[in-house]
Amino acid sequence: MPTLIDATSTPAWGTLSGLKSRFADGPHKLRRLFDADPHRAERYTLDVADLHVDLSKNLLTDEIRDALLELAAQMRVTERRDAMYAGEHINVTEDRAVLHTALRRSRTDELHVDGQDAVADVHEVLDKIYAFADKVRSGEWKGVTGKPIRTVINVGIGGSDLGPVMAYEALKPYVKDGLECRFISNIDPTDAAVKTADLDPETTLVIIASKTFTTLETLTNARCVRAWLLDGLVAAGAISDTEQARRDAVAKHFVAVSTALDKVEEFGIDPVNAFGFWSWVGGRYSVDSAVGTSLAVAIGPKGFEDFLAGFHAVDEHFATAEPERNVPLFMGLLNIWYTNFWDAHSHAVLPYSQYLHRFPAYLQQLTMESNGKSVRWDGSAVTTDTGEIFWGEPGTNGQHAFYQLIHQGTRVIPADFIAVANPVHPTKDGGTDVHELFLSNFFAQTAALAFGKTADEVRAEGTDEAIVPARVFAGDRPTTSIMADELSPKVLGELIALYEHITFVQGVVWGIDSFDQWGVELGKKLALQIAPAVSGNDEALATQDPSTQGLVTWYREHRR
């Protein structure tokens, strides 16, 4: 590994600190910048694959841009990127390669990692997934009673759930008619109960997604769904109540995304129907691996290939574009600018597409699990803030909920606005094109956040002087606008890859390992220790802290 560089000790960091101090003087800075440069929007608008990205409404000058790019150079971001693409073990704490980019490389490529051709391995699994997807979609794959599959349930959690459900929701217009996917992740029994309540076990296929086939939540839910399906088949008289009949039903109604073939077989799944992935694929980077099997079934192999092509297009851009035209690099550096120099603690992602309603939740795991770290990859403490809280809702819902805070709150909240030019459902309200009305809000919000409203402009509207201050908008609230022609599988792949690489850039600058997630381990271990106390074991209860003892005792007293 290269020597760790402390970003705060670089010349570029000092330059940026000085630029921030000067830039912060005076209100309505973006108004002045646009007035001074009629070509600002054109100069700060970049294209990456099918994405049209307007960065001009950010708190940015050419001098700041150059200093940010110099910071990237001094932190050797491109060298670290190349190491990732080459399969070097940049996941230091787990001594692993980080190769989600290999999941979408061309079949003709080669990439040897730890003695294996990763690209060949990927396409071997993809071919298997596509053959399976075609069988389900065509009706060739049938349940134990001979009926074709109508519902696919994906049982997973974290990256094995958030990515597939987000992508399925985003691409619903591309889903095969008569086929539905549902997703069970929460160990709360309500999740599985509600998701299966109206389903027919005879036409339901279950995908259990767990690399090790040991994830507590996933295996608990998998066993519950197995019991629901088998008991339902028996109750309907579809199968006899024998062990052999139940085993036959599991073999027809369950497949796995896992590499633990012994555990898969023990569950009752034929290992032939297990789709593998690798230690160099992190969960939050795995939607385009076998974890996306449910999506491949839903949108078909061609749709999934287009999805992968979108990822690859942005991978190529990130690898080859000049720094000043490199969109993921630039956006990652802007996030550093706001987090570390503007004291921004959160980042809003505001898709003006209802189909992207799960995209902010997906980005929460991608960004916060990756960069929510207080220790650098060499074990030393970080020297500056890291990570942001990512959040958001689709427009225009958010406008009537939390935009107030973004417009007039006391903290800078950078926001990414995402929209498509062509809707899936063109609709007219009388003579009004509803999508155009919808996107008018998209355009208006970024303008309002950037340019605000002065006290004189408020007074010119005849506003009572007493409430003028409350109706002033300071402006200078930074936004990035991302647009595409339509929300296709390829465009969705591009969006995901864009944010993957943004997250990577930030992690390199902060000197952290963006590809481990030790923060999720402690709570999981403690839950196993506390479980006996919850179930009534007083000795186990006595080992807990007083607060936990009190909470568990209250629960035991009130549980019926």
Swiss-Prot record:
BP GO terms, sorted: gluconeogenesis; glucose 6-phosphate metabolic process; glycolytic process
Pathway it works in: Carbohydrate biosynthesis; gluconeogenesis; Carbohydrate degradation; glycolysis; D-glyceraldehyde 3-phosphate and glycerone phosphate from D-glucose: step 2/4
Record field: catalytic activity: alpha-D-glucose 6-phosphate = beta-D-fructose 6-phosphate
Residues annotated as the enzyme's active site: E369, H400, K524
EC number: 5.3.1.9
UniProt keywords, alphabetically: Cytoplasm, Gluconeogenesis, Glycolysis, Isomerase
CDD domains: SIS_PGI_1, SIS_PGI_2
Protein known as: Glucose-6-phosphate isomerase
Species this chain originates from: Cutibacterium acnes (strain DSM 16379 / KPA171202) (Propionibacterium acnes)
